[in-house]
Regions:
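C-terminal soluble interaction/assembly domains
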Residues: 272-343
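Sec-exported extracytoplasmic/periplasmic mature domains
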Residues: 46, 65, 76, 128-132, ...
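Extracytoplasmic/secreted envelope proteins and their assembly/folding machinery
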Residues: 35-38, 121-124, 225-228, 232, ...
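Acidic/His-rich structured neighborhood in mature extracellular/periplasmic domains
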Residues: 88-252, 270, 324, 328-331
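N-terminal mature-domain "stem" immediately C-terminal to a signal peptide or N-terminal signal-anchor/transmembrane
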Residues: 20-89
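C-terminal motif of bacterial Sec signal peptides marking the signal peptidase cleavage site
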Residues: 15-18
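Short acidic/His-enriched helical or mixed secondary-structure segments at domain edges of catalytic enzymes
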Residues: 256-281
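Bacterial N-terminal signal peptides that target proteins for export
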Residues: 1-7
Length: 343
């Protein structure tokens, strides 16, 4: 199968990337979501005295009763914050001491978060516009957790942002052998500030519409993932596609230039689209430096990109379809009625 370089498709791709899902944006300026304020749990935690960690944590729990317990038990993995749980206090103390240099490295970059508050406020307005019944997180909080901890987490009462996941692609600890083993460069290149709001809104989209495609045929997983990308474009109309898809612009251009060849690959691969074999599905859904059996220019997670094209084709044929209606439509229906056949 002959794959093309994206040069001839560049103009089309640029136009597509600029427009994409963003051409019918509503005016959300009048939607009230309140003032978005990011509570600085990170600053408060690393201001504790490590010699009096128990007293400090209890003060912190009084100030942040909606997050401190979740931080200790779930993010640090130390169990409940209780007098009888000495492991929790020791784990918190060790983490504070060992990660203080990390916090000091991040502090200049994230001293102010007003820019992020503005981005989230705009995103929350789009969420409320499309899904008025959804209850937005009442709190937004910044923390610094272990490097294998979440970059974004939705707790019962908050949207929590783990700044350790956004130290910059060239942050020294990401580039160590251990760091690269945990987060290879095709992942850590996205550990930049511009991905924070997109990751937050993607987490909210997943909270509104939990992913139930696990164990389903590959094509259903593809359309499910692609549908999330389509929704991300609606919730973040000013955000480049390269941010919420996780692709580089070059990868998006390559996919656009080779769309028909990519689709033919799936059609010619012995009922691959209907496979439920996890070992097969993981080659096309999920992180990876490239797609198995495709050229080096191909991105990983190519199945999500194809699913995205299928969703866009379906939406273009169903004028007036709302995001809620799309997200409630069975993915097999979306695939079959899209009659997706790229030229």
């Amino acid at each position: 199968m002959n794959y093309r370089t994206p040069l001839l498709a560049l103009l089309i791709a640029v136009t597509f990337i600029r427009c994409g899902n963003h051409d019918e944006r509503p005016d959300v300026s009048g939607i009230n979501v309140g003032d978005i304020h990011i509570d600085r749990f990170d600053t408060a935690f690393f201001g504790l005295d490590s010699n009096h960690i128990a007293a400090g944590l209890y003060r912190l729990d009084h100030e942040y009763p909606w997050f401190t317990g979740a931080f200790v038990s779930d993010i640090l993995g130390a169990g409940p914050l209780a007098d009888s749980n000495h492991v929790a206090f020791e784990a918190a103390r060790q983490f504070l001491v060992s990660y203080l240099p990390i916090r000091d490295s991040l502090e200049p970059r994230y001293r102010r978060l007003d820019w992020l508050e503005r981005q989230l406020q705009t995103g929350f307005r789009y969420v409320k516009y499309y899904f008025p019944r959804y209850k937005l997180p009442p709190k937004v909080v910044a923390f610094i957790g272990p490097f294998d901890g979440p970059g974004v987490a939705l707790t019962t009462y908050s949207l929590a942002i783990g700044l350790q996941s956004y130290a910059g692609r060239n942050f020294s600890l990401y580039l160590t052998p251990k760091g690269q083993d945990m987060y290879p460069q095709y992942i850590s290149r996205r550990f930049e500030p511009e991905y924070i709001a997109a990751n937050c809104l993607s987490a909210i989209a997943g909270d509104i519409f939990p992913d139930s495609s696990d164990g389903r045929p590959l094509i259903e997983e593809m359309v499910t993932k692609g549908r999330y990308w389509w929704l991300a474009g609606r919730l973040m109309p000013d955000t480049p596609d390269s941010i919420y898809t996780g692709y580089t612009k070059a990868q998006l251009d390559w996919c656009t230039a080779n769309e028909s060849q990519i689709w033919n690959f799936f059609l010619q691969s012995n009922d691959l689209l209907y496979s439920v074999d996890p070992d097969q599905i993981k080659n096309y859904i999920g992180e990876g430096p490239k797609t198995l059996a495709m050229p080096d220019g191909s991105p990983g997670n190519i199945g999500a990109w194809v699913g995205w094209q299928i969703v866009k084709k379906y939406v273009s044929d169903h004028h007036g379809l709302t995001p809620l209606q799309l997200m409630q439509t069975p993915v097999r229906t979306i695939f079959e009625e899209s009659k997706y056949k790229p030229r």
